[in-house]
Amino acid sequence: MAILEEIDDVDNMDFDPAEFDPRAVLTDATAHQESDGRGPINLISKAEHERREQAKKQQEQQQEQQQQANPMAQLQQMMDQMNQGGGMPPNMGQQGKPGTQVFDSEEFKNQEIQESDFKDWQIVYPVYFDKNKTVGEGRRVPLELAVENPLGQTIAEACKMLTLPSIYEAHKTHPKDWANPGRVRVQLKDDPALGLPPHSVKNKRHLFRLIAQYMKEHPTKEVTPYQGPVFQKIIQTNPEFPWNSKNLPPKPQYPRGWKMPEILPILSPALSHGEANNDMMEQMANQFMPKIPEAPPQQKVKKMKVRVGR
């Protein structure tokens, strides 16, 4: 036989009147509204709110100290700012065209970030996309994807468009393309656990094809080097720099038979900046096309003839 039990409808089982303090009732003067954006607004005391804010500040300070002690964490923080559109940290290069970031190796050293921290990143040179180069001379893309006068700053813009962490080293040159400085280091890994943003680049070959397509859509013009971040940085440090988009330098003079771009970056050693530099060209020619050394003169040896009588 079923037994009916009368149940009290009042839910006061957890309430102890002895613990009630009328002075602790939350009022407009003592309450703070708290919400995490996912649920209803909670009322907490202002003292509790101040305690939580203080703990949050201490946690942020500890994270900042850890990032300063860890160069890779500092580098990753810069990459996060780049990918979120927050710009570059101060004293870490200049920003020119939208999507272009410039990092100089010396500035990384000043920030206690060594080149060894990103030595395993893929390196991309402009010569890989030069239409006037053969495969043996450094070209790495098919001829139909190659372009005229490729520049490192355009490669950096392409990597930024692809949301790839990249570093533009404006002074670095390829041994077979000494007149066209500028290379880009690219991180192709896609690991959210490491804070690396997702991307659609499959491998290095796919990356070269995407960069080549970007270069096809953004051909190099004579004013292109003077619209990039390197030129902006030079103007800031040297306002009397003679060349700009309206006053272009004379075209570089190469030794006969050399295949070199006609449009070069500002930092190219082939640009004389208005003055002929024959000594530099001679040194370059001797460095990359050394002359065959002549054999030392040999001393004449006197030959003695002896007659033998019969």
Curated annotation (Swiss-Prot):
It comes from the Eukaryota. InterPro entries: Signal_recog_particle_SRP19 (IPR002778), SRP19-like_sf (IPR036521), SRP19_arc-type (IPR022938). It is found in: Cytoplasm. GO terms for molecular function: 7S RNA binding. The keyword Ribonucleoprotein applies. Pfam families: SRP19. Gene3D superfamilies: Signal recognition particle, SRP19-like subunit (3.30.56.30). Coiled coil: none annotated. Keywords: Cytoplasm, Ribonucleoprotein, RNA-binding, Signal recognition particle. The keyword Transport does not apply. Residues 46-59 have a biased composition (Basic and acidic residues). Residues 60-73 have a biased composition (Low complexity). Its main location: cytoplasm. GO terms for biological process: SRP-dependent cotranslational protein targeting to membrane, signal sequence recognition. Belongs to the SRP19 family. HAMAP family: SRP19. PANTHER family: SIGNAL RECOGNITION PARTICLE 19 KD PROTEIN, SIGNAL RECOGNITION PARTICLE 19 KDA PROTEIN. Signal-recognition-particle assembly has a crucial role in targeting secretory proteins to the rough endoplasmic reticulum membrane. It must be involved intimately in the translocation of a wide variety of protein substrates. Fungal signal recognition particle consists of a 7S RNA molecule (scR1) and at least six protein subunits: SRP72, SRP68, SRP54, SEC65, SRP21 and SRP14. This is Signal recognition particle SEC65 subunit.
